[in-house]
Amino acid sequence: MAGNFWQSSHYLQWILDKQDLLKERQKDLKFLSEEEYWKLQIFFTNVIQALGEHLKLRQQVIATATVYFKRFYARYSLKSIDPVLMAPTCVFLASKVEEFGVVSNTRLISAATSVLKTRFSYAFPKEFPYRMNHILECEFYLLELMDCCLIVYHPYRPLLQYVQDMGQEDMLLPLAWRIVNDTYRTDLCLLYPPFMIALACLHVACVVQQKDARQWFAELSVDMEKILEIIRVILKLYEQWKNFDERKEMATILNKMPKPKPPPNSEGEQGTNGSQSSGYSQS
């Protein structure tokens, strides 16, 4: 782990401007509304979380995989590579980078197949269509896009430090930690430094637990306007999330999602899976 966030590739290359992010997303917003795109973000974060839990990965590995996923689609359209392929690829790469140990090929494919069938069958009625050669090829494109900038900083460590400094670990840490986990269903990890996200999550936890921490926050040397921006995104997430019926809505949204086109000369090779067995756009 690099020692200084401000000198890291995470800060120098992967804290993005919101307007640039929205500009890159316009290709997908021709097919999806902003709300539908946001629901896709939640859904595929849930897929990565479920896959990581099935493989018994640490939460930091799952969080890193989620950041990789978001970084790729911050630069490319959803139709460039099928997100159903990208999700396990990100988990595979993150498990190596975070020194969890390489997840075996058999376990990864078995986990993806099982998770889609048991947890997300309402959205994916067919079998997981990819094999390890697809994941290794997808990993190459992911590494190329990220320019091998693989170290990701997360809000968990600064959150621990802040809660300990505040002296309310038992009261605040479990809730603030869950809120940090939820932020990965938004764009926050692409837009703000992790310590700011940690402070915003702690602030929300203080409000929920009715802990008066105004003095503690007032003494911080931090741009509170940015913290409030993050808090607004978190509150918006919870407001929209409670009205999101994933089981009813996702099949329709996935059908609208732009998809990779099959290579023109491989129609006969793809069998029943069509373009999904390729997973890559040729356009």
Curated annotation (Swiss-Prot):
<keyword id="KW-0805">Transcription regulation</keyword>
<feature type="region of interest" description="Disordered">
    <location>
        <begin position="252"/>
        <end position="283"/>
    </location>
</feature>
<dbReference type="InterPro" id="IPR036915">
    <property type="entry name" value="Cyclin-like_sf"/>
</dbReference>
<dbReference type="InterPro" id="IPR013763">
    <property type="entry name" value="Cyclin-like_dom"/>
</dbReference>
<keyword id="KW-0678">Repressor</keyword>
<dbReference type="Pfam" id="PF16899">
    <property type="entry name" value="Cyclin_C_2"/>
</dbReference>
<dbReference type="GO" id="GO:0006357">
    <property type="term" value="P:regulation of transcription by RNA polymerase II"/>
</dbReference>
<comment type="similarity">
    <text>Belongs to the cyclin family. Cyclin C subfamily.</text>
</comment>
<dbReference type="GO" id="GO:0005634">
    <property type="term" value="C:nucleus"/>
</dbReference>
<keyword id="KW-0804">Transcription</keyword>
<feature type="compositionally biased region" description="Polar residues">
    <location>
        <begin position="267"/>
        <end position="283"/>
    </location>
</feature>
<dbReference type="InterPro" id="IPR031658">
    <property type="entry name" value="Cyclin_C_2"/>
</dbReference>
<dbReference type="GO" id="GO:0016538">
    <property type="term" value="F:cyclin-dependent protein serine/threonine kinase regulator activity"/>
</dbReference>
<protein>
    <recommendedName>
        <fullName>Cyclin-C</fullName>
    </recommendedName>
</protein>
<comment type="subunit">
    <text>Component of the Mediator complex. The cylin/CDK pair formed by ccnc/cdk8 also associates with the large subunit of RNA polymerase II.</text>
</comment>
<dbReference type="InterPro" id="IPR006671">
    <property type="entry name" value="Cyclin_N"/>
</dbReference>
<keyword id="KW-0539">Nucleus</keyword>
<keyword id="KW-0195">Cyclin</keyword>
<feature type="domain" description="Cyclin N-terminal">
    <location>
        <begin position="46"/>
        <end position="144"/>
    </location>
</feature>
<comment type="function">
    <text>Component of the Mediator complex, a coactivator involved in regulated gene transcription of nearly all RNA polymerase II-dependent genes. Mediator functions as a bridge to convey information from gene-specific regulatory proteins to the basal RNA polymerase II transcription machinery. Mediator is recruited to promoters by direct interactions with regulatory proteins and serves as a scaffold for the assembly of a functional preinitiation complex with RNA polymerase II and the general transcription factors.</text>
</comment>
<dbReference type="Pfam" id="PF00134">
    <property type="entry name" value="Cyclin_N"/>
</dbReference>
<keyword id="KW-0010">Activator</keyword>
<dbReference type="InterPro" id="IPR043198">
    <property type="entry name" value="Cyclin/Ssn8"/>
</dbReference>
